[in-house]
């Protein structure tokens, strides 16, 4: 199992910025793993498959899911559930609600470490670029040049804005 645990995530939980977080839950929402077993409705993956796990779980049926805002899924297991309300990637085993849309097979040619970027880091950048309605005459500002910021930069570049500004703290 490969997993990441971002500094922002840890600070948000520690300082109460995630009101739906359940005390005592094992954290971790960026993960890659091997399927041990599946529910009866899961057909896209099978035991033994290496998979990425989406950061958001979503029902696919509510208003928000049908309109592409899966992070606001109204189902009790929807939205940011893994590592927040359900044991996450730092646990030995993880139950993934709505696994049919929440797991993606990893090709053999892709390492676990590379695949780890898909579930949250790249997905965040892609989502930001997608919903921002960026036009070719726009200037886009990205705050933070860490892995998520760089993935956001790459996705924003696909929109061809006039200017892209990436802000990062000078470590000196």
Role assignments for model-derived ranges:
Residues 6, 55-58, 69, 99, ...:
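Glycine-rich beta-alpha junction loops
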Residues 139-145, 154-172:
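Adenosine-nucleotide cofactor-binding segment
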Residues 149-150:
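N-terminal Rossmann-fold NAD(P) dinucleotide-binding loop
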Residues 10-14:
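Cytochrome P450 core scaffold surrounding the K-helix E-X-X-R motif
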């Amino acid at each position: 199992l490969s997993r990441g645990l971002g500094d922002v995530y840890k600070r948000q939980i520690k300082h109460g910025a995630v009101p739906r977080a359940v005390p005592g839950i094992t954290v971790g929402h960026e993960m890659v793993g091997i399927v041990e077993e599946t529910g009866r409705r899961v057909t896209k993956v099978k035991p033994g498959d290496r998979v990425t796990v989406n950061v958001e779980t979503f029902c696919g049926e509510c208003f928000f899911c049908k309109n592409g805002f899966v992070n606001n899924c109204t189902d009790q297991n929807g939205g940011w559930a893994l590592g927040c309300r359900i044991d996450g990637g730092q646990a030995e085993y993880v139950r993934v609600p709505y696994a049919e849309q929440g797991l993606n097979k990893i090709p053999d040619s892709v390492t676990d470490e590379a695949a780890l970027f898909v579930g949250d880091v790249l997905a965040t950048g892609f989502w930001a670029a997608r919903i921002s309605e960026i036009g070719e005459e726009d200037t886009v500002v990205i705050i933070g040049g860490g892995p998520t910021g760089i993935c956001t930069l790459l996705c924003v570049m696909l929109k061809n804005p006039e200017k892209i500004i990436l802000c990062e703290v000078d470590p000196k």
